[in-house]
Amino acid sequence: MVGSTRVRFGKAQAMKWDLLSRDRFDAVLFDLDGVLTATAKVHAACWKTMFDEYLRTRANKTGESFRPFDIQADYKAYVDGKLRYDGVRDFLKSRAIELPEGNPDDPPSAATVCGLGNRKNDMINEVLQSEGVEPYEGSVVLVRQLRRKGMKTAVVSSSHNCLAVLQAAKVADLFDVRVDGEVADRLHLRGKPAPDTFLAAAKQLGVPPQRAVVVEDAIAGVQAGRAGRFGLVVGVARKGEADALKDNGADVVVGDLSELVHEA
């Protein structure tokens, strides 16, 4: 922990609307999926579909037993919050499967790390186009309130679909800076749990990490916030993952960001 702004808050304090007070912080950096928009479950479902198709095909060829991708265990442990190709690598490593790296131009049919990642990307794009995106109401209210207080806001996401999701949810104009998978590739930034993308967003905003807040729902994300020595790391546990988020770097955990909204 660095600086006087980083504090461990108790449960009662964590629910106070002034947790994100203007005198303590200048900016709030939000993850996208599961924090701002209800797209985390869509990503998880697409990862499962893609990996299960690959694993089933592999099992048929090798004679190995087919063990499907588990959303509860595998998604949280190996994929959630990470850059797409990092997620592919980490999950395959957990199954002792080695594939060629390939390159980002690989077709979705290629049996490479990039090919599998591109296959998943095609799936999520199809879902976004057909079903649209809904933002979490409490999150939108909080972001608007923070901006009225003069605080800067950013989206920091591992997704290459970040801008499309923000536009579909009609919230793109609520953020001063966006650091996503596309930006990470261009700037050669390491993905979460490394703090690089959050640090890049804070730098673009002109705010030191100690004066910025990270808001995340993924284990890799809160780990990144802690590694970057940000002033406060807020975990969002919509499905009861509070203990895991606290154990991995969250200073406080809420079930929904509406808990941090000041009701005048």
Question: PLM features: residue spans?
Answer:
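N-terminal helical cap/lid subdomain that shapes the substrate entry/recognition surface
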Residues: 17-32, 36-137, 148
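Short amphipathic alpha-helix with an adjacent loop that forms part of the alpha/beta core around
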Residues: 19-20, 259-264
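Short acidic-hydrophobic, aromatic-tinged amphipathic segments that line or gate anion-handling sites
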Residues: 252-256
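N-terminal amphipathic/basic-hydrophobic helices that include classical n-h-c signal peptides
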Residues: 1-13
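Conserved SAM-binding loop
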Residues: 36, 135, 155, 214-215, ...
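Substrate-recognition "cap/lid" segment bordering the active-site pocket of phosphatases
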Residues: 9-10, 133, 151-152, 160-213, ...
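Short glycine-rich donor-binding/catalytic loop of glycosyltransferases
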Residues: 237-240, 257
